[in-house]
From Swiss-Prot:
Protein name: Large ribosomal subunit protein P2
A molecular function (GO) term: structural constituent of ribosome
Region annotation Disordered: where it falls in the sequence: 80-106
CC terms in the record's Gene Ontology section: cytosolic large ribosomal subunit; extracellular matrix
Record note on quaternary structure: P1 and P2 exist as dimers at the large ribosomal subunit.
Organism, scientific name: Dictyostelium discoideum
Statement: the UniProt record of this protein carries the keyword Phosphoprotein: yes
Functional description taken from the UniProt entry: Plays an important role in the elongation step of protein synthesis.
Organism placement in taxonomy: Eukaryota, Amoebozoa, Evosea, Eumycetozoa, Dictyostelia
Gene: rplp2
InterPro entries for the chain: P1/P2_N_sf (IPR038716), Ribosomal_P1/P2 (IPR027534), Ribosomal_P2 (IPR044076)
């Protein structure tokens, strides 16, 4: 993701190449993987950045919509399993040693 963000910043300046992406990443203290920078630049070279962003938004929206119902169904059994645990946790109160017939100040 950071490589993509650096590429997008470099493309805004009109200088989207591996050297620019590397310089951007190093400026914020990222340890740069040169092979990954080359791969990102090669994959995105010549593509419209706005079209890539629009395609990414549509993919993220479809994944989020599909994942939401799955999370809701898995939460119900977990809540049902947690309810019996509360009944078992009840502790017995220890009897106090206060009234054993040995009062010091009777």
């Amino acid at each position: 993701m950071k490589y993509l963000a650096a590429y997008l910043l470099a493309s805004l300046s009109g200088n989207a190449n591996a050297a620019s992406v590397t310089k951007i990443l190093q400026s914020v203290g990222v340890e740069v993987d040169a092979a990954r920078v080359e791969s990102v630049c090669k994959e995105l070279d010549g593509k419209d950045v706005q079209a890539l962003i629009a395609a990414g938004k549509s993919k993220v929206g479809s994944v989020a919509a599909a994942a939401a119902p799955a999370a809701a169904t898995s939460a119900a059994p977990a809540a049902a399993a947690a309810a019996p645990a509360k009944k078992v946790v009840e502790e017995k109160k220890e009897e106090s040693d206060d009234d054993m017939g040995m009062g010091l100040f009777d």
